[in-house]
């Protein structure tokens, strides 16, 4: 996507990422880079006015040149792509698609956290590790049942959000099933 700067390149910015509220991230996408500096400042933020992903180069977190970092890059790139198509998507769907991107690259998040939280709601996003794992499992299931990566791409392409977006992707892919089935 090159909507803002007309440059098809994506900048991968490697830096030592400080912790946020006690959590250290392997990478992140900032939607503020997708608007002008003037717009970002109205939110008290700044914009690089380009397609940019931030990746942690602290080897204590993840090897910045190792195969796991490719999965992190795929995860963050999915956020960038999804934002350009559907900036109002619910977090649980966007994160589920991003977690699925990590599965495709062979280094998904470990399946920890979810077994200790089996009552964790799929569509209620609290940014807990169990939320990420749960959406990873659910979107991997959707992929396996309804057409692989092409189906996940269809979900990303839908401009309707949340459950309705998944149902619309099912219909667009020729499945006569709804979310509650």
Q: Where are each of the predicted segments found?
A:
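Extracytoplasmic/secreted envelope proteins and their assembly/folding machinery
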Residues: 71-74, 78, 95, 99-102, ...
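Metalloprotease/metallohydrolase-associated module, dominated by Zn2+-dependent proteases
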Residues: 99-154, 161
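Generic alpha-helical structural element
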Residues: 62, 87, 127-128, 144, ...
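Juxtacatalytic substrate-recognition/specificity segment
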Residues: 1-90, 97, 107-111, 120-124
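Phenylalanine-focused residue identity feature
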Residues: 12-14, 20, 25, 29-32, ...
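Beta/coil-rich, acidic/histidine-enriched accessory regions frequently appended to metallopeptidases
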Residues: 161-181
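Extended hydrophobic/Leu-rich segments
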Residues: 1, 139-142, 170, 177
């Amino acid at each position: 996507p090159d909507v803002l700067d007309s440059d098809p390149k994506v900048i991968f910015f490697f830096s030592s990422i400080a912790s946020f509220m006690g959590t250290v991230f392997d990478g992140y996408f900032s939607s503020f880079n997708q608007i002008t500096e003037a717009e970002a400042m109205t939110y008290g933020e700044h914009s690089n006015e380009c397609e940019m992903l931030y990746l942690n180069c602290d080897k204590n977190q993840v090897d910045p040149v190792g195969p796991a970092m490719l999965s992190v890059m795929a995860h963050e790139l999915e956020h960038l792509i999804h934002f350009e198509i559907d900036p109002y998507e619910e977090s649980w769907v966007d994160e589920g698609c991003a977690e699925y991107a990590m599965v495709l690259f062979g280094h998904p998040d470990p399946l920890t956290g979810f077994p200790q939280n089996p009552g964790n709601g799929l569509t209620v996003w609290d940014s807990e590790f169990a939320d990420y794992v749960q959406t990873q499992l659910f979107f991997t299931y959707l992929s396996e049942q309804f057409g692989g990566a092409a189906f996940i791409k269809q979900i990303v392409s839908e401009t309707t959000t949340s459950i309705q977006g998944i149902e619309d992707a099912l219909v667009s892919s020729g499945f006569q099933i709804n979310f509650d089935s």
